[in-house]
Design a protein with these regions (language model features):
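Surface-exposed polar/charged interaction patches
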Residues: 22-25, 49, 179, 234, ...
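Generic structural signal of hydrophobic/aromatic residues within well-ordered alpha-helices
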Residues: 42, 169-176, 224-235
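Intrinsic-disorder-associated interaction segments
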Residues: 80, 162-165, 221-225
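Extended serine/threonine-enriched, polar tracts that run as long, contiguous segments within proteins
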Residues: 136-216
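Accessory, usually C-terminal, subdomains that scaffold auxiliary metal cofactors
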Residues: 181-188, 192-193, 197-258
Length: 259
C-alpha cells in the first residue's frame, strides 16, 4: 500500500513538473507562423450530395462538419457559437467542373458587379457574359464554444437559400439591447452566444438542410469574450485570410442547394 502511494505521488509530481515546463515554454515552435500558415475552418452543412457522406465514418446529411479538424456535429443538438464579425461579398466562380476550384474574383459588397449579370431561363444563378457566375455570399466569422467552454475560430458561409437566414441572424444580433449609464445601447456582436441547429428544407428544385438560429444569452466568460474580441479585431484588420473553394471542393458552401 505504501509503495502504491509512493508511485502515485511520483506520478503526480512528474505531471506537475511537466505542466510547469509546458507553461514556461508556451507558444514555442510557432514563432515563424502567421495567418498565412493557418487554415480557418469552415462549418459546413452536409447534404446527401456532400462528398463526405458515405466516405467519412459517421457523416450524415444534416450534420455540421469542421473542414479542418474533421469533427462532426449533430445537427439536431447543434453547436454553440459566438458571432464575431460579418463580411458580405460577391464571389465570381467558373462553371462547375471548370477552373481551379478557387474563386475567379472576390468583389466587395459595394460592387455593382450584379448589374453586369443575367439569368438563364429556369436558372437563378447570376451569369456574367464570360460564362462565370456571381454568388452573393454572407461570411459569418464565429467562435465555436466546445463542451469545455474553449473557443475556436471558424467561418460559416451562407448563400443561395441561406441568405435569408443570414439576414435574420443579423437582425437578431442588432436587436439585442443592454442598459448602461447612458441608457440603452447595442452590445458588440461578440457579446452573445447562439445555438445553431439544422433542419430539412425543400422547394420545387429539391431538398437540402438549412440553418436554424437561436440566441442563448450573453457570454459569461471573460476569457471567451476577450478571445472573441481579438478575433473580431483580426478580421476587421484584414489579418484573417479565407480560402474559399467552389462547389466541387465544397469548402465554402453548405453542400449543393437548389436555387
Amino acid at each position: 500500500m505504501a509503495k502504491t502511494t509512493e508511485i502515485a505521488e511520483q506520478k503526480a509530481n512528474t505531471a506537475l513538473a511537466i505542466m510547469s515546463d509546458l507553461e514556461q515554454d508556451a507558444g514555442m515552435g510557432f514563432e515563424n507562423m502567421n495567418q498565412e500558415d493557418y487554415a480557418l475552418p469552415f462549418l459546413r452543412l452536409l447534404t446527401s450530395t456532400s462528398p463526405e457522406v458515405g466516405e467519412m465514418d459517421g457523416a450524415m446529411p444534416g450534420m455540421v462538419l469542421n473542414t479542418v479538424t474533421g469533427e462532426l456535429y449533430d445537427g439536431k443538438k447543434g453547436i454553440m457559437v459566438v458571432p464575431c464579425a460579418y463580411i458580405r461579398q460577391y464571389i465570381e466562380w467558373a462553371p462547375r467542373g471548370q477552373g481551379s476550384g478557387a474563386p475567379v474574383h472576390v468583389y466587395p459588397a459595394t460592387s455593382d458587379i450584379l448589374s453586369q449579370t443575367h439569368r438563364e431561363p429556369g436558372d437563378n444563378k447570376d451569369y456574367l457574359d464570360n460564362g462565370n457566375y456571381i454568388e452573393n455570399t454572407a461570411n459569418h466569422y464565429v467562435m465555436v464554444i466546445d463542451a469545455d467552454g474553449v473557443p475556436n475560430p471558424a467561418l460559416i458561409v451562407m448563400k443561395s437559400t441561406q441568405l435569408k437566414k443570414s439576414r435574420k441572424w443579423n437582425s437578431m444580433m442588432q436587436s439585442v439591447k443592454m442598459t448602461g449609464k447612458n441608457g440603452l445601447f447595442t452590445p458588440p456582436m461578440y457579446s452573445q452566444v447562439y445555438r445553431l441547429t439544422t433542419a430539412a428544407e425543400s422547394n420545387d428544385k429539391g431538398k437540402w438542410y438549412g440553418w436554424e438560429i437561436e440566441r442563448v444569452g450573453a457570454v459569461e466568460s471573460n476569457d471567451v469574450y476577450l478571445s472573441c474580441k481579438q478575433f473580431a479585431q483580426s478580421v476587421g484588420a484584414g489579418d484573417v485570410k479565407v480560402k474559399h473553394e467552389g462547389a466541387d471542393g465544397a469548402g465554402a458552401g453548405n453542400g449543393s442547394q437548389p436555387f
